[in-house]
Amino acid sequence: MKRKLDANDVPSPEVAETKETSDADEADFESLNLDPRLRQALIKEKFTKPTPVQAKAIPLALAGKDILARAKTGSGKTAAYVLPILQTILQKKAADPSLKATTGLILVPTRELAEQVQKVVTTFAAFCGKDVRSVNLTQKVSEAVQRTMLSDYPDIVISTPARVIANLGNSSLSLDNLTHLVIDEADLVLSYGYDEDINALSKAIPRGVQTFLMSATLTSEVDTLKGLFCRSPVVLKLEDKEEKGAGVSQFVVKCAEDEKFLLTYVIFKLQLIKGKVIIFVGDIDRCYRLKLFLEQFGVKSCVLNSELPVNSRIHVVQEFNKGVYDIIIAADDQEVLGSKSKKAKNAGADEEEEAAGVMGSSDDEEAEDDKKSNRPDKRRKLTAKEKDYGISRGIDFQNVACVLNFDLPTTAKSYTHRIGRTGRGGKTGMALSFVVPADQYGKHKPTSFPTAKHDEAVLAKIVKRQSKHGHEVKPYHFEMSQVDAFRYRMTDGLRAITRLAVQEARAREIRQELVKSEKLKRHFEDNPDELRQLRHDGELRSARIQPHLKHIPEYLMPSKGRKGISSEDVGFVGFRKSSDNRIRKARDKNRAKGKGRKPSGVRKVDPLKTFNRGRK
C-alpha cells in the first residue's frame, strides 16, 4: 500500500510519535472559540469541560492538522472530531449560505456505531437549523432511497466503507468537495474485512483532505491507514488521570464448564450484582442456551447478535441505556473472526493481536507489531452481516455495573475492549471472567465450548498485559459449600435446554424481531408511545418450563443471601379474608364509642306520624 501524496505529489513524511498526556489542562469549551450555536448545544447536553482528548484534538483540528488519536473507550473521541467538522461547515455556510456540498465523511466499522455517531451529530447540530444536514448510509433502505438522500448533497455522510464504495460506484455520492475524513475505531475497519473498500476509497479521496483516525489501540492496521490517508499527522496518546485509578475491578473465577451456569444462576437469582450487566458469550447458540437457562428461573434477559435485524439491535441498546433491561447476553465472536488466525498455544503469534492494556499497546509492543506486520494475512472473510455487527467496540453502553465474561475471549485485545463497556466516564465498574482449567475441559459435553481449551493460556497473557499498565486481575472465590446446594436445580434447568430447543428459540427470535423491525418501523415512528411496549426480553418458551424453579426454597438460601433477598421485618401479612361488611363493621364500632348517636333526651320522631301533606 502506498502512502498518500500531498499537493506536490510527494509522499507524506513519517512523523515521530510524540506522547501527549492530559496533564493539568484547565481548558473549557469557551476557550475553543466554537460557534455560539455549538456552545448552546453543549450547554443543553451539560458538557461543562472538555475531556483530555477533546481539549487536545479540537484546537489541532481547527488549525487544519491531521490527527491520529489513541484514547480509551468512553473518553469522548466522537465529540473530538464532530465539533471541528461542524465548526468548519458553519463557517463556510456563513460565508456562502447557498453552498451545497458533502464536506465531511465519517467511516465506522458497524451499523450500531454509525447510528450512535449520527445521534451525536444531530445533538450538536440541534441549534444550527438547516445549515447542517447529515445522512446515515447504513440504514436499511433501498438503493433508490439512498440515491434520493444523497441527491441533496448532505454536509456530513456517515457510513461503513462498503456503503460508500457502492454509492460512489453508482454516482450517487460525490466526494469532489470533501474536506474532512474520519475513520472511527480505525483498528477495526481493516479487521472487519474492508481492505478492498479502503484501498478503493484512498484513490477516490481528493488531495488535501483533513483526516482523523480515532482508535483505542494503535496497531499495524492503524499504521496502514495512516500511510494511506494522513499527511504528517499529529499523534495523540492520551492517558486519562481517571484511568490510572481503579476504574474497573477485574476478577477471575476458575470453574468447571457446567459450573459456569451454576454460578450465573446464583449471581442473578441471589442478586449478588446490582445494576446492569453485559454477559459476553462465544457464539450465537450460547446466547440462546444461556437465555433459555435463565428463563427457567424467572430471570429476564435479551440477546444481541449479528443475526438480529439492525433496527432491533439498535433498539435493544437504546432500551438498555434507558434502564428497561438489566441483562444483555451478547455474542462477541467478531473479535475472533476478524483477527488473524493463530493457535492459542503459540505465545509469539499472539503479540500482534494482543497489543492491549486498558489503554492499548505500549510503544515497545507497537514496535514489535511493526516488525510482524509483514506476515501474510490469514483473515477469514466476514459475511455482510458479520461486517455490520460489533458489540464489544464503540457502542456507547451507559451505566454498566458489570461485564461478565461467560466465555473468556481468545485474545487479550478482545478482553480489553469487552471490559471497556463498564467503568466509562470516570465511573467504577467490575469485570468478572469465568476460566475453565485445562483438567476440567471436555468433562461436561453439553456445556463444553471449544475456546475454553486454551483459557489458562489466554488468562496468563491477559494478566501480563494488564499488569504492565498497573491493573490487577484478582482471583474470586465463591463459597462452593453454599453454592452446591443449588446444583440440583441448575441440573434440572440445564437438562431442559436441548439442542433442538436452542434452534427453535433462535428461529423464533429472528421471526419475532423481523416483524418488529420491518413491518412496524414506520408505525412506531408515528406512534412513539406504543414503541415503549415493544420488549425484547420476553420468554421464548421453546424449552420445557418448570415453574418450581422460579422460586428459591427458604432452606436453600444462605443466611447472607436470605437477608439480601427479603427484609426480616415485613410486618403483618394477613392470609385470611374477612367475610364481614367492612363499612357496617366500622359504623358499629363508632356507635360503640358514642359516635353517631343522637343526644340523650331528644324525643324520637316517627316519620309516618309527622308526615304533612302539602297544600294544593
UniProtKB/Swiss-Prot annotation:
Catalysed conversion reaction: ATP + H2O = ADP + phosphate + H(+)
Chief location bin: nucleus
Species whose genome carries this gene: Aspergillus niger (strain ATCC MYA-4892 / CBS 513.88 / FGSC A1513)
GO CC annotations, alphabetized: cytosol; nucleolus
Function: ATP-binding RNA helicase involved in the biogenesis of 60S ribosomal subunits and is required for the normal formation of 25S and 5.8S rRNAs.
CDD domains tied to this protein: DEADc_DDX56, SF2_C_DEAD
Positions with biased composition (Basic residues): 584-601
Keyword Hydrolase: yes
UniProt motif Q motif: location: 27-55
Keywords: ATP-binding, Helicase, Hydrolase, Nucleotide-binding, Nucleus, Ribosome biogenesis, RNA-binding, rRNA processing
GO BP of this protein: maturation of LSU-rRNA from tricistronic rRNA transcript (SSU-rRNA, 5.8S rRNA, LSU-rRNA)
Domain Helicase ATP-binding: 58-236
Region (Disordered): 1-29, 340-385, 579-616
Motif DEAD box location, chain numbering: 184-187
Domain Helicase C-terminal: 247-481
Name of this protein: ATP-dependent RNA helicase dbp9
Pfam family, one: DEAD
Location in the cell: Nucleus, Nucleolus
UniProt domain comment: The Q motif is unique to and characteristic of the DEAD box family of RNA helicases and controls ATP binding and hydrolysis.
Family designation: Belongs to the DEAD box helicase family. DDX56/DBP9 subfamily.
Signal sequence range: none
SUPFAM superfamilies named in the record: P-loop containing nucleoside triphosphate hydrolases
Molecular function per GO: ATP binding; ATP hydrolysis activity; DNA helicase activity; DNA/RNA helicase activity; RNA binding; RNA helicase activity
EC numbers for this chain: 3.6.4.13
Top-level division of the source organism's lineage: Eukaryota
Phylogenetic classification of the source organism: Eukaryota, Fungi, Dikarya, Ascomycota, Pezizomycotina
